[in-house]
Regions:
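Amphipathic alpha-helical polymerization modules
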Residues: 1-126
């Protein structure tokens, strides 16, 4: 693959991986108040051919769930407690911001490679 093609492929796989990461962060934020919900985390791994990255398996954060005291809640046990989620909104917002910035960086790289390819085609056309 040409250097420009490799650049486009790397940037595209980076954007796809960050979009996937942002989707999981969004799910975590949406379920922050869901009783018994465990935060989802993903990791990144390099593609075998070295042309980009992909997201690894989704894992559940096994950190202890928050115990909430609300005797009137339908899920409360005999002591009046139930399990909340282990989602920390500050962490999720920070992860979302990082994923957004990484996506934007890959988008700029993709756009630069596209512009370089277009310039090359314009030169060759003359």
């Amino acid at each position: 693959m040409s250097d420009l093609g490799t650049s486009l492929s790397l940037a595209a796989s980076g954007m796809q991986a960050q979009a996937n990461r942002l989707r999981h962060v969004s799910e975590n934020i949406a379920n922050a108040d869901t009783p018994g919900y465990h935060r989802k985390t993903i990791s990144f791994q390099e593609l075998a051919d070295g042309t980009g990255v992909e997201t690894g398996p989704v894992r559940l954060d096994r950190k202890a769930l928050t115990r909430i005291y609300d005797p009137g809640h339908p899920l409360a046990d005999e002591t009046g407690h139930y399990d909340g989620s282990n989602v920390d909104l500050v962490t999720e917002v920070a992860d979302a911001r990082e994923a957004q910035r990484s996506y934007e960086a890959n988008l700029r790289m993709f756009d630069q490679a596209r512009q370089m390819a277009q310039s090359l085609f314009d030169i060759l056309r003359k």
